[in-house]
Design a protein with these regions (language model features):
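Short glycine/serine- and small hydrophobic-enriched flexible loop segments
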Residues: 36-43, 132-138, 319-322
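Acidic-enriched catalytic cores of C-N bond-cleaving enzymes acting on peptides and small amides
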Residues: 98, 117-180, 185-188, 202-228
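Acidic/histidine-rich catalytic neighborhood of metal-dependent amide-processing enzymes
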Residues: 27-101, 329
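Acidic/His- and Gly-rich active-site-bordering loop/insert found
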Residues: 1-22, 43-48, 294
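Hydrophobic beta-strand positions in extracellular immunoglobulin-like domains
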Residues: 110, 198-200
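Acidic-glycine-rich active-site phosphate/pyrophosphate-binding loop
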Residues: 2-15, 99-109, 288
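Short glycine/proline-enriched loop/turn "hinge" motifs that connect secondary-structure elements
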Residues: 2-4, 46, 97-103, 185-189, ...
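An extended, acidic, His-containing surface patch that forms the Zn2+-binding/catalytic region
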Residues: 142-176, 228-329
């Protein structure tokens, strides 16, 4: 759960109208709101003959391929089976999320030659080669990405540009266990690996994203002595956007106006979520993310969800169900 918590991350303390705990915001608060909305609808309209389905899949953070992607492949999001989808991600109770940026994940390995650490000139340090890669990123790739801007309404503001995170770096020998009290081996590392997390814009083709990184690596191969690398793609997700005129967008918009007395804000998410599978595998375009919570709190110490926000979102979801599913008077 990370360091810095002042509340037990697994106890769901309620303090000043906020429920604290790991996952309360992202996205158990939204899931709870959707369950309350569905239960209230069924209780209020016991003769309703249609179907309301809540899918509580568990692997969205690791790609969603065993959850929503599997359901989509089995036809559960076929427009003949399901007509409207709300994913209760924490984009805030007065926002409607139309889609998300794209993502490209890859591993880069720089290669060297092992040798005794007292004679590094007899080997070739893969970590130093990786340092050259990182320097290219700092001087060329990061400034280029920061200069790009999208017309997608991505929040927060910093995500309106392309971004890349270096998720991990590993080089040389395996780290020793905490209880190891010896000295590290004296070896020149012959391998160094980083995992990159590149988030790209609707205006950027995926091939351009790949080629930009590979081009920097090829440039180093040409200019740096003995530089060698291997680039392995881990996963890719294309950007997704639902049209603002879609029925689910218009219906939730009106519910926000009616329940909260304010105009909704239309946004896009900096990271991908299960809409990518519903859109491209399920072929259902009538899908949004809507739910309580502040996206900036996701995965943070003292993550919380406000009870009042959950109630308001449940009311919006309930009103949406009535509009979409009941006969018009």
């Amino acid at each position: 759960v990370g360091a810095g918590w002042t509340h037990d991350p697994f106890r769901a303390d309620i303090v000043d109208g906020k429920i604290y705990g790991r996952g309360t915001c992202d996205m158990k608060g939204g899931l709870a709101a959707s369950i309350i909305a569905a239960e209230a609808f069924v209780e209020t309209h016991p003769d309703f003959a249609g179907a309301i389905e809540i899918s509580g899949t568990a692997d969205e953070e690791s790609g969603g391929y065993g959850g929503v992607a599997y359901l989509a492949e089995q036809g559960y999001f076929n427009p003949d089976h399901v007509q409207h989808v709300i994913i209760p991600e924490p984009l805030h109770k007065d926002r409607i999320c139309l889609g998300h940026r794209g993502g490209w994940w890859a591993q880069i390995e720089t290669k060297g030659e092992i040798a005794h650490g007292s004679m590094p000139f007899l080997g070739d340090c893969a970590v130093r080669h990786m340092g050259a890669v990182l320097a290219e990123f700092e001087t060329k790739l990061f400034p280029a990405m920061a200069a790009r801007r999208t017309d997608m309404p991505v929040v927060p503001e910093g995500a309106r540009s392309s971004t890349m995170n270096i998720n991990s770096i590993h080089g040389g020998q395996k780290e020793n266990d905490d209880d190891f009290d010896g000295l590290p081996a004296h070896c020149v590392p012959d391998s160094c690996r980083i995992t990159i997390d590149r988030r790209f814009l609707l205006e950027e083709p995926l091939d351009q994203v790949r080629d930009e990184v590979r081009g920097l690596l090829e440039g180093l191969r040409e200019t740096r002595i003995d530089f060698d690398y291997e680039l392995t793609e881990i996963n890719s997700v294309l950007p997704s956007m639902t049209d603002q005129t879609a029925p689910i967008v218009q219906t939730v918009s009106q519910a926000i106006r009616d329940i909260m007395g304010k105009q909704p804000e239309y946004v896009a998410s900096p990271g991908s979520y299960d809409q990518k599978h519903i859109d491209r595998i399920g072929k259902l375009k009538n899908c949004i993310a809507y739910g309580p919570g502040l996206l900036e709190l996701a995965h943070k110490p003292d993550e919380y969800i406000e009870v009042d926000d959950m109630v308001d979102s449940a009311c919006v979801m309930g009103a949406t169900l009535e509009t979409l599913l009941l006969p018009r008077k």
